[in-house]
Every structure is written in C-alpha cells, then in structure tokens.
Amino acid sequence: GSANDQLAIADMRDLADSENFILVYPDAFPDPNSGQETNWQVVTSGDLPFTLPNPHSDILFIDQLIDHLHLEVNIDLNRVYALGYSNGGGFTFDLGCRLNNKITGIGVVARTMYAETYDNCIVTHPTPVVTILGDEDYISNYDGITYEGTLYYQSSDATHEYWIANNNLLPTSNLSSVPNINTTDGSTVELYSWSSEDECIDLYHYKVIGGGHDWPGTFGNMDIVSHEKIWEHLSEY
C-alpha cells in the first residue's frame, strides 16, 4: 500500500480543514530486507506465516515523524491519533502498544490485533480505541486466525477484551442502533461501546453485519463513513 492508496480510500482533507487538525498520510519506510517494499512492517520476529525474522520496523520512523512534525508545525503532542486499514490497521494497533507514550488514541478498520502485538503490548495511559470490522471479513477474520495450531490474529472479542482490561473499562457493553440508511449494500451496523466508571475513556466497536474486508463509507457498507466516525470519537480526547 501507499499514502496515495489510503488517501483514495479515506480522503480526510475536507474534514481536517473543517475540524482544524493536521492530517498526515505517511508512506511506510522502504524495507531494505524485503526489496524496499513499503508495506507497514508490523511484527519483526517472523511469527506470522508469511514473514521472516526482520530487524526492520516502521515504529521508529513514526516516532521520529511525530518529533519532526512537532518541530516543524508545532503539533499538540497530547493529541496525536493514528488510524489504519487492513495491514495498516495491524500497524496502528502496534503503534498504540509500542509507541503508546506518543499516541493518544487509535482507529482501526478491517483488522484485529496480531497475536505478537497482543502478547507484547505495553499501555502507559488510558487509550481510546475505535474499531470497525465486518463479520464476513475473510481476510481479517472476526473470530481471529489460527493456522496449524498457532494463533496469528486475535479475535475481535479478544482484541476488545484487551483494551477493556487495560483501560479499566466496565465489562458490559452498550449496544446502540445505527440507522440503515443504505438498504442496498447488503449489510447493517451495530455499535458497541464500553466506558470507564468516570466516563473519561471509551472503546467503540462498529460491527458490520454482512460486511467484508471493506472501508465502510467508501466501499462495502454505506451506512457509516469510517474515518468520520473514528474522528468523531477520538477527537473527544
């Protein structure tokens, strides 16, 4: 993928102008160990069936990018958010864990947590999270992915249980209806939310019933616009 690919999927420029926030679409740092490809390097141990041990990581790149933006345009370091789709969503979970000291909140579309990210996640502050996932996504399976007895992707439930526990949220979710404004897209949306006792931090999950490996609002479900919903929630923090 590339920055232009993500821009085509989720063009947030008008939203950034109207809401007055700085918007950045970075390209992944070229991986010297993998033919200079620019896919986000999420895990480095080779634990996934399609990866080999690789010391290259884009975490340091994003770490330095945040510092650069602070120096160049004086971004508010207390309000830095990351969002991503598919592999970029896995990388976003990784940022929320491994760069938690610099990431305020995250939004992830069409991905659950990698098992390695889940096992090594270190959260230093309550972290608002928004997830959007179709229950018929056969690339980022809603129930997780296990291959030859090894768990590679956590289920959606396990992913949310992690953030519920580490954000000290109440375990019971609130279910809200989402209007089915497009009756021809073959899907509907349910919104699940969890809050802390003082309602200072939240977790939101948009479950797309009948949804695939999509970015709702651009393709697939058309009842919500993924990036608008993510900003709506994360901008509260």
Predicted regions and their residues:
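Serine-hydrolase catalytic machinery in alpha/beta-hydrolase-like enzymes
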Residues: G1-Y81, F91-D94, R98, G217-F219
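Alpha-helical scaffolding within the catalytic cores
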Residues: L7-M12, T112-I122, D185-W194
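Primarily recognizes the serine-hydrolase "nucleophile elbow" in alpha/beta-hydrolase
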Residues: L71-T127, Y138
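Short, proline-enriched alpha-helix->beta-strand connector loops that line the catalytic pocket
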Residues: T124-V129, E199-L203
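Short beta-strand/loop motif that positions the catalytic acidic residue
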Residues: T131-L133
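Acidic catalytic loop of the alpha/beta-hydrolase fold
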Residues: E136-S140, H213-W215
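Acidic, glycine-rich loop-and-strand cores that form catalytic or ligand-binding grooves
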Residues: E148-G186
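Catalytic active-site module of serine/aspartate enzymes centered on a nucleophile-bearing elbow/loop
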Residues: M222-Y237
